[in-house]
Amino acid sequence: MQNRQITIAELPTDALTPANFAMIETDMPTPGDGEVLLRVILMSIDAANRSWMKGATYRAAVQAGDAMPTYAICEVMQSNSPRLSAGDIVAAEATWSDYITAAAHKVQKLPKVETLSHLMSVYGIAGKTAYHGLMSIGNPVAGETVLVSAAAGSVGGYVGQIARALGCRVVGIAGGPEKCKWVVDELGFDACIDYREAGLSKKLAAACPTGVDVYFDNVGGKILESSLNFMN
């Protein structure tokens, strides 16, 4: 049985195209002692993947010929560890492949849920980042104003919804009128500022008349600098 993988055929110098990737077939991997054979069910394809190709993040740069790394939800097909059994659902650092092997102590056993995609989204990296960042660092209190940049993104969207559930006034920052409308209408933010329009500081002052108690930053740069001016 062969294992399909998507590898980096050529590192990009500009926008990604199909020519940057190649589909190959390799022998099925065999788990060693303390390892598990995993079938990749769902994988997360994120904007950060592009940064990995440039080495502009915390992880080593992806090289030409490498299978593209990813975060994935997988099923244990074979286990050589007492930690896990065949049929378990786990989260793992994986690659764009049908099957991978991994050390059992480096994967996380997950509860079985009706909708597996929830394990990738709200219970995955984005949801955990939003929850722990807001609750462990921000410590919002009902009635406070929470400002969130990249509010239409996965982390920002979760942050805003959690803050609203806690009784906070939530103001988002996003790019473009359609995103801002979606953030307010669908995610329930109290307001959303379009950073592409002129007058960001004036818009922040209008949307946050009592100042900002918690700012959840997802972008840095000028948006961060402008937002810090309104912190209580």
Give short role names for the model-derived ranges:
Residues 68-75, 86-150:
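NAD(P)H dinucleotide-binding glycine-rich loop of Rossmann-like/cofactor-binding domains
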Residues 16-27, 56:
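Short glycine/threonine/proline-enriched tight-turn/helix- or strand-capping micro-motif at secondary-structure
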Residues 124-198:
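Mid-domain Rossmann-like dinucleotide-binding core that forms the NAD(H)/NADP(H) cofactor-binding site
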